[in-house]
C-alpha cells in the first residue's frame, strides 16, 4: 500500500499516519513535494516506477492505494524511494539476500501507472537470494551492509558498477555459510566520520553479471474506491 498526505498540525504525542491491516506493517515514509516519482521494489525481484500525482492525497486514517502487485502471500515490499525527475545524477541500487548488488540508471525503469507488476530489477536466483533493499544513490555516497551475524561493512558507491535491470549484479560481500544480509543503508560523503566498529570493505572481484530475457505479463486493475479501502491502478502495466 502507498499513500500521500499532509501533516500540517503535528502533535507532540504524534498522529496516526496510516491504518494498518492485520498482518501488514509500515515499511517507510518519505518527505516529498508531491511532484516526484515513486519507486517500490518487492523481494521477488521486481520494481515499479510511477508519477506521484497518480496517488491522490487521502486522510491520515486511510489504508492507502496499491503501489505494486506482489507475487503471492510470501512476497512483500522491501524498498521505497522518491526521485526527482530533474535529478540525473542518481542511480538505483539494489542488494540481494546473499550479498549481490548493482546500480542501474533510473531511466531503465519505464514510467507506468501504480498498482501494476512493474519490471524486473534484479535476476533473483538461488545463488543471489531474494531482494532485500532498494535505494537511490549518488557516486559520492557510501553503502552500509549489515549481516545477520553482526558483521557490518562500509563501501563506496562508486566501487559498485552499473548493470542492466535483468542481471544479478556483483558480489558486494563474502558471507559465511548460513549468513545473509539483514539491513542496508546509505550515508552521504562525511569524510572520515566512519564508526570505528565498521570494517571498511571493497566490492568483491566475483563480479558475475548474468543477463536474462524479459517477458511481459499484463496486469488488470480496478477503479478507485473510498479512503478506507484498497485502491488499485487504473491502467494495464507489465512485467519485463
Task: Tell me what each language-model feature is.
Residues 3-240:
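Short, structured "edge-of-domain" segments at secondary-structure transitions
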Amino acid at each position: 500500500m502507498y499513500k500521500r498526505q499532509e501533516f500540517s498540525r503535528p502533535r507532540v504525542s504524534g498522529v496516526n499516519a496510516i491504518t494498518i491491516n492485520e498482518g501488514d506493517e509500515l515499511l517507510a515514509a518519505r518527505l516529498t513535494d508531491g511532484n516526484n516519482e515513486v519507486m517500490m521494489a518487492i523481494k521477488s525481484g521486481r520494481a515499479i516506477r510511477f508519477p506521484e500525482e497518480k496517488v491522490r492525497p487521502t486522510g491520515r486514517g486511510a489504508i492507502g492505494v496499491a503501489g505494486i502487485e506482489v507475487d503471492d502471500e510470501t512476497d512483500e515490499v522491501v524498498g521505497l524511494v522518491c526521485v526527482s525527475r530533474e535529478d540525473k545524477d542518481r542511480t538505483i541500487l539494489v542488494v540481494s539476500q546473499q550479498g549481490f548488488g548493482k546500480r542501474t540508471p533510473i531511466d531503465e525503469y519505464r514510467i507506468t501507472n501504480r498498482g501494476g507488476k512493474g519490471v524486473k530489477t534484479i535476476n533473483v536466483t538461488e545463488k543471489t537470494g531474494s531482494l532485500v533493499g532498494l535505494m537511490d544513490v549518488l557516486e559520492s555516497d557510501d553503502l552500509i551492509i549489515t549481516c545477520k551475524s553482526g558483521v557490518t561493512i562500509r563501501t563506496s558507491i562508486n566501487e559498485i558498477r552499473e548493470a542492466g535491470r535483468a542481471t544479478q549484479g556483483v558480489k558486494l560481500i563474502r558471507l559465511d555459510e548460513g549468513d545473509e544480509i539483514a539491513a542496508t543503508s546509505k550515508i552521504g560523503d562525511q569524510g572520515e566520520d566512519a564508526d570505528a566498529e565498521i570494517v571498511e570493505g571493497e566490492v568483491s572481484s566475483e563480479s558475475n553479471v548474468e543477463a536474462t530475457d524479459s517477458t511481459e505479463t499484463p496486469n488488470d486493475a480496478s477503479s478507485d474506491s473510498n479512503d478506507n479501502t484498497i485502491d488499485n491502478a487504473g491502467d494495464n502495466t507489465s512485467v519485463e
